[in-house]
């Protein structure tokens, strides 16, 4: 039986080290996988990009999106970001609805995300 695996992470690169193996295994077994990032990590996880002269937040987001999309693609998953911002990443009522809608739309058999203390 193939599984639908959905990964929801705070930042665009979180899924690689948190769930990459599970995603690859599910896809190899004929399942589907979707990765959702709440944020691109444009402020807190993109230090090297900010060292480039003339860097902009829009460009950092574009680069982070391309990196995450490529990584997800290598694992056989789709990728999208809710682009909720970073530092601070605040989850308000609208953000919760976006997350709930994404879960309902994909209807995963397995949902992988952060622990409640992460």
Show the residue positions of the predicted features.
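Acidic beta-strand-to-loop metal/phosphate-binding motif
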Residues: 110-118
């Amino acid at each position: 039986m193939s599984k639908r695996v959905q990964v929801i992470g705070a930042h665009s690169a979180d899924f690689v080290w948190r769930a990459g193996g599970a995603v690859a295994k599910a896809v190899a077994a004929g399942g589907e996988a979707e990765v959702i990032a709440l944020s691109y990590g444009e402020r807190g996880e993109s230090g090297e990009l900010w060292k480039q002269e003339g860097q902009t937040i829009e460009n950092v987001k574009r680069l982070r999106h391309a990196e995450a999309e490529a990584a997800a693609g290598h694992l056989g998953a789709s990728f999208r970001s809710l682009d909720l911002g970073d530092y601070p990443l605040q989850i308000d009522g609208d953000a919760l609805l976006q997350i709930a809608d994404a879960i309902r739309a994909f209807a995963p058999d397995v949902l992988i995300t952060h622990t409640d203390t992460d």
